[in-house]
């Protein structure tokens, strides 16, 4: 234990020989490390209870790193698998999404992945996990169950589940294997000659899959492309550059990294000839498109190669590097900022590290103007702003509570599980839809369950009422407040009818995924996707497309 503590303290005390620091900084570092060392020695010697060095010092390390930014993280030896999963998108397990069932207060199967162990042994949406290798999973959290489902590739365990639709329990032997999270869950043709690629993670080998998908789409007759980066949180920079290279000529600068040290600086260029540098493209982005997604969308925007459509991206312009530590740990730390071809950095938050460090959002008024290759104006900070802003439909409050696992009766999950049990097969994914009678049955279930949820109008009315009382105006407007309360009181039937289409689409999407997995859910949802519809509309109008990328200069 003392050896572990000594090693951890030496890591903290170490000052890189290559760092060019002034004497004041050097003194402050040595002084505070000495204080830290002295504090822990006194704690270890005098504290009333015996301390766990790994826990106490580990908490200190984590607190220090949290004060810098959300991406700088310490991974001790026992968490190295977590880091590997993050970097590769791979883990050893059963290949299924699990969730907590609030009605039964147990963890259940939410979505088995296609061609993975969970699906192959017959596990279905809603199956309740009772035990793993005879260890009872009652009252266990999702993270606990997840840890027990994972293990070494090739290892087997006995899984006991209960199927809610029949009430029967079943015991199956499951063999874990390496699971590659689907980074390209679906690609195919939209209307006419428009190809579509749904891409959700820049992990190892993902560029090869995108290349294969794009070539296949061209063989199918694709003359234009919708490339969907919505909810893609990023990943490998090299994979991003390889994908960008499919659409940009050889020799183009895509990315420049700039850090404190010379070795952190790097320029990425397209290295080979592209597959297609002229095909019209629309790239879809949203607020969850981050990092490598912003490198790709921003680079294509800066070279006027594609129209970016959707909502402003996340704004992560920082680069992380992993470094080895003693005792087989690693630290993932921010070592550079990246700049896309126009010279801008998309970082939205400024992490201040001076006295009393704080986080500051870069306001639009302080952003700088940059220019694309064709002279269009773009700005730094705050992510990549789309050329065409199209906001998705807002999630109705009742749908949020039904689908957001806040319903203690689990009305939506139970309806879906029962529907799946009654229907061995359904229509093809892109054609499937629930009938009005199906929705009426769901509506009846919701009403019988005495479903409760908060309405935003009621919440704001209560806040307004409190404010009126505080300022002394409530008595004068009491009658109006009472009338509004009656008008805005809960009417679940009305809300279910008013939001029928949206809720129906949520149900259809969940049900389809049980038969056709993630690819089917994507196909089904595309029928109602406002942003995809706008992308198709734009690609079907070459003059509008050209007007955006090459506007007439005044």
Regions found by a protein language model. Name each.
Residues 18-32, 36-53, 76, 85, ...:
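Cleft-lining beta-strand/loop regions that shape enzyme active-site pockets
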């Amino acid at each position: 234990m003392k050896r572990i503590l000594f090693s951890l303290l030496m890591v903290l005390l170490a000052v890189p020989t290559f760092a060019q620091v002034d004497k004041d900084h050097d003194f402050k570092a040595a002084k505070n490390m000495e204080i830290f060392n002295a504090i822990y020695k006194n704690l270890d010697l005098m504290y009333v209870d015996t301390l766990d060095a790994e826990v106490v010092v580990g908490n200190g390390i984590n607190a220090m790193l949290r004060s810098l930014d959300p991406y700088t993280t310490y991974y001790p030896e026992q968490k190295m698998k977590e880091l590997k999963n993050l970097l590769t998108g791979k883990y050893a397990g059963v290949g299924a999404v699990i969730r907590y069932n609030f009605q039964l207060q147990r963890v259940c199967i939410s979505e088995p992945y296609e061609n993975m162990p969970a699906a192959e042994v017959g596990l279905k949406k809603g199956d309740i996990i009772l035990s793993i290798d005879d260890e009872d999973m009652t009252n266990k959290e999702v993270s606990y169950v997840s840890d027990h489902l994972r293990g070494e590739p090739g290892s087997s365990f006995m899984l006991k589940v209960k199927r809610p639709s029949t009430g029967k329990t079943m015991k199956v032997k499951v063999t874990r294997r390496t699971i590659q999270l689907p980074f390209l869950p679906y690609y195919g043709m939209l209307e006419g000659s428009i190809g579509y690629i749904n891409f959700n993670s820049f992990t190892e080998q993902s560029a090869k899959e995108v290349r294969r998908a794009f070539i296949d789409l061209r063989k199918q007759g694709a003359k234009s492309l919708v490339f969907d980066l919505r909810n893609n949180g990023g990943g490998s920079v090299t994979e991003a550059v390889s994908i960008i290279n499919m659409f940009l000529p050889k020799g183009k600068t895509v990315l420049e990294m700039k850090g404190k040290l010379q070795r952190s600086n790097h320029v990425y260029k397209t290295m080979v000839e592209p597959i297609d540098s002229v095909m019209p493209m629309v790239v879809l982005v949203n607020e969850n498109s981050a990092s490598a997604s912003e490198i790709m969308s921003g680079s294509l925007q800066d070279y006027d190669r594609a129209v970016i459509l959707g909502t402003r991206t996340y704004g992560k312009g920082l680069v992380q590097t992993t470094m080895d530590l003693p005792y087989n740990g690693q630290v993932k730390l921010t070592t550079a900022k990246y700049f896309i071809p126009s010279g801008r950095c998309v970082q939205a938050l400024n992490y201040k590290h001076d006295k009393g460090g704080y986080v500051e959002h870069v306001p639009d008024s302080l952003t700088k103007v940059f220019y694309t290759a064709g002279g269009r104006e773009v700005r730094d900070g705050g992510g990549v702003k789309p050329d065409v802003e199209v906001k998705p439909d807002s999630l109705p409050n009742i749908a949020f509570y039904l689908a957001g696992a806040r319903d203690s009766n689990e009305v939506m999950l139970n309806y879906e599980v029962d529907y799946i049990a009654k229907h061995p097969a359904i229509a093809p994914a892109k054609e499937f839809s629930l009938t009005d009678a199906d929705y009426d049955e769901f509506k009846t279930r919701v009403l019988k369950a005495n479903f409760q949820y908060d309405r935003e109008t009621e919440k704001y009315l209560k806040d307004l009422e409190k404010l009126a009382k505080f300022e002394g105006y409530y008595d004068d407007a009491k009658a109006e407040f009472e009338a509004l309360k009656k008008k805005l009181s809960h009417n679940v039937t009305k809300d279910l009818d008013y939001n029928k289409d949206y809720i129906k689409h949520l149900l259809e999407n969940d049900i389809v995924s049980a038969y056709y997995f993630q690819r089917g859910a994507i196909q089904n949802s595309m029928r109602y996707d406002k942003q995809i519809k706008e992308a198709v509309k734009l690609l079907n109008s070459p003059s509008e497309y050209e007007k955006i990328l090459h506007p007439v200069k005044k």
